[in-house]
A protein has these predicted regions:
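C-terminal motif of bacterial Sec signal peptides marking the signal peptidase cleavage site
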Residues: 19-22
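Core segments of small alpha/beta cavity-forming domains
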Residues: 48-121
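Surface-exposed, charged secondary-structure patches
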Residues: 114-160
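Expand to "…catalyze enediolate/carbanion chemistry for C-C bond making/breaking, isomerization
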Residues: 15
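Bacterial N-terminal signal peptides that target proteins for export
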Residues: 1-12
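Bacterial signal peptide processing site
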Residues: 24-27
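Short beta-strand edge/turn micro-motifs at domain boundaries
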Residues: 144, 153-155, 165-205
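Post-signal peptide N-terminal segment of mature Sec-exported envelope proteins
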Residues: 32-58
Length: 205
């Protein structure tokens, strides 16, 4: 795993924050928070149809739901960055992530928006696994969620539809994302507190 703490280099931040590359984006503040197919076009919202999975408890299910919603939200942004300015992105991500993660995404998408890039193609979620809930000393509940996906069909194109070869637009074929999901003592919802990614050869069963 490639580990980084803020501030990240611009390219690494762009990839990590957008959920496309093997990096970790770690916030600097303390919070006060199976196979699934995901299909995406330049303007379509990815959809997911979960298949049967082992029994999980309410906290695991809630954390997994938010992690998947976060992935879907970022897919919307990557498919049409011009549609999501800073304020629309904040509105989209505020229910799903802590402020430092939102800022990382704002920084990460800026290059795409400025250059007229967007993402086309489809990705397939091959594994989704919520870990056991942990109760922290401050009353926060923590769940680690792993999502492994096949990104081989994804392509970043410019405003003319030409494939972008710049490093800031490249991601691995298979990516295993690990989300540190946290729900603070007085909150009803989990949010993404920390994000990490591993480039893998494939997603095992």
């Amino acid at each position: 795993m490639v580990l980084n703490r803020f501030p990240l280099p611009a390219i690494a931040l762009a990839l990590a924050a957008l959920g496309l590359a093997a990096c970790t984006a770690t916030p600097t503040t303390t919070p006060s928070a199976t196979a699934t197919s995901v299909t995406q076009t330049a303007s379509a919202t990815p959809t997911a149809t979960p298949t049967p999975s082992p029994t999980i408890d309410a906290d695991q299910a809630a954390a997994l739901e938010v992690a998947e919603s976060y992935e879907a939200a970022l897919a919307k942004v990557r498919a049409d960055p011009a549609k999501y300015d800073q304020y629309k992105m904040i509105d989209l991500l505020k229910p799903l992530a802590y402020d430092d993660m939102i800022q990382a995404n704002l920084n990460g998408i800026r290059t795409w928006r400025d250059k007229g890039w967007h993402e086309e193609g489809s990705q397939i979620i091959l594994q989704r696994d919520p870990g056991q809930p942990n109760s922290m000393s401050n009353g926060t509940t923590k769940v680690s969620v792993t999502i492994c996906k096949d990104q081989r069909d994804l392509v970043v194109v410019d405003k003319n539809g030409k494939k972008v070869t710049a490093k800031a637009a490249q991601g691995p074929d298979f990516l295993k994302n690990t989300y540190d999901m946290r729900r603070s003592k007085n909150s009803e919802s989990f949010k993404v507190y920390e994000f990490g990614g591993d480039e893998v050869d494939g997603c095992g069963s």
